């Protein structure tokens, strides 16, 4: 029962975090929301210590802080962030999104620890299947009840959405495996490399111009 509860909580927290991040895009100063969402690694270090008892060396914490600061600067796209920005709706949504993703990490790790197996990879993959199954049920039910007209569109684009879903599932499998085998904050911090990969993909594959703040 605790395993199912942790998986359900992880799925719900991830949905809330994603919705808050999308809400941040709807505000004028959405850049602040995106930047503050990148504080998830620092939030993870604090909450994992309080809830899971995970401890990190001061050197590791300092490295995470520097990494988070760098990612926030890149995410801000050259825009200067000030302390008052933290109370803006976009920033609050960003912080809430970071908290949602952090709690997802903690719930996933807790779920993996509940399984009676020493195979952490197996535990992570079982948790992944349950979490994504629960998310599919929740969101599918919502669409079926509230936005039924969207269902034909979903099925008509199954080829494209299937490819995206497969890549997302593979990414989630890596995330879940990381959470099951290493401290939450470290996994989140290393995962920030996605920003560098995104910039590289944007520059060399999509041929998009680089912004001054990304230099």
Can you say where each PLM-predicted feature lies in the sequence?
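Hydrophobic alpha-helical transmembrane segments in multi-pass integral membrane proteins
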Residues: 44-59, 99-114, 166-184
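Short hydrophobic/small-residue motifs within alpha-helical transmembrane segments
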Residues: 11-12, 38-39, 99, 166, ...
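Membrane-interface helix-loop-helix junctions at boundaries between adjacent transmembrane segments
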Residues: 21-62
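Residue-level recognition of transmembrane alpha-helices
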Residues: 7, 37, 60-64, 128-132, ...
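Alpha-helical transmembrane segments of compact multi-pass small-molecule transporters, enriched
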Residues: 36-50, 134, 138, 171-174, ...
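Residues that define the loop-to-transmembrane-helix transition and helix capping
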Residues: 31, 57, 122-125, 185
């Amino acid at each position: 029962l605790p395993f199912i509860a942790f998986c359900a909580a992880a799925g719900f927290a991830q949905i809330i975090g994603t919705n808050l991040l999308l809400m941040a895009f709807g505000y004028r100063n959405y850049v602040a929301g995106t930047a503050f969402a990148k504080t998830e690694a620092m939030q993870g270090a604090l909450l994992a210590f309080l809830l899971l008892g995970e401890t990190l060396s001061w050197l590791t914490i300092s490295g995470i802080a520097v990494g988070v600061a760098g990612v926030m600067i890149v995410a801000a796209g050259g825009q200067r962030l000030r302390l008052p920005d933290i109370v803006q709706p976009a920033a609050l949504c960003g912080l809430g999104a970071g908290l949602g993703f952090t709690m997802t990490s903690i719930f996933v790790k807790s779920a993996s620890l509940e399984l009676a197996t020493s195979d952490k990879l197996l535990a992570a993959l079982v948790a992944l299947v349950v979490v994504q199954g629960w998310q599919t049920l929740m969101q599918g039910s919502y669409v079926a009840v509230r936005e039924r007209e969207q269902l034909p569109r979903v099925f008509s684009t199954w080829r494209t959405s299937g490819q995206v879903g497969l890549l997302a599932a593979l990414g989630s499998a890596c995330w879940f495996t990381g959470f099951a085998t290493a401290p939450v904050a470290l996994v989140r911090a290393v995962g920030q490399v996605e920003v560098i990969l995104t910039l590289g993909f944007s520059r060399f594959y999509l041929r998009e111009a680089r912004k001054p703040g990304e230099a």
